[in-house]
């Protein structure tokens, strides 16, 4: 509520939200994806990336294979490639968090350096509708 009272704006998806900061339209971005910010900073944008002192949620990007995949061998080979040295280095160079703990990022915070919140998933699901309605109400007030 305090952020909304301070003129919170919801400019759009990740790229649009970050551009609002880099163009000076707004002074901060809350809850953006960090890899876009690291990329922009590497390109010379005058921004910094901060994680909340109390922790944040890290959203993993899993790879899955359908039980009904028509070419199971190729699907497994692709997932194996995703975790290969080559692919994990590409992930790190794209400012994403590698899926393997032995691959480190030189140009961003590594997973072990980011304090993570341990969500209470049951509580979150039980309160999801009410929380979503409140966030939508706050966002609508400033972006209406």
What are these regions (language model features)?
Residues 82-105:
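Periplasmic-binding protein-like
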Residues 78:
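Substrate/cofactor-recognition hotspot
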Residues 1-52:
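Ligand-binding pocket segment of bilobal, Venus flytrap-like solute-binding proteins
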Residues 107-144:
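Extracellular/periplasmic bilobal clamshell ligand-binding domains
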Residues 34-38, 54-57, 70, 84-85:
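Solvent-exposed loop/turn segments at secondary-structure junctions
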Residues 17, 36, 71-75, 87, ...:
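Stable alpha-helical elements in mature extracytoplasmic
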Residues 59-71, 90-91:
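A bilobed periplasmic-binding-protein/Venus flytrap-type ligand-binding module shared by bacterial periplasmic
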Residues 22, 41-43, 56-58, 69-73:
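Extracellular/periplasmic catalytic domains that process cell-envelope and extracellular macromolecules
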């Amino acid at each position: 509520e305090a952020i909304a009272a301070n003129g919170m704006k919801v400019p759009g998806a990740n790229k649009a939200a970050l551009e609002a900061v880099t163009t000076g339209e707004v002074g901060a971005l809350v809850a953006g994806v960090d890899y876009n910010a690291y990329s922009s900073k590497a390109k010379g944008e005058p921004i910094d990336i901060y994680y909340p002192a109390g922790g944040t949620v890290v959203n993993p990007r899993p790879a899955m294979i359908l039980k009904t995949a028509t070419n199971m061998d190729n699907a497994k080979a692709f997932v194996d490639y995703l975790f290969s040295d080559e692919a994990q280095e590409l992930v790190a160079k794209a400012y994403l968090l590698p899926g393997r703990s032995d691959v480190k990022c030189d140009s961003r915070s590594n997973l072990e350096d980011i304090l993570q919140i341990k969500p209470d998933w049951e509580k979150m699901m039980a309160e999801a509708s009410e929380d979503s309605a409140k966030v939508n109400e706050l966002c609508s007030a400033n972006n209406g």
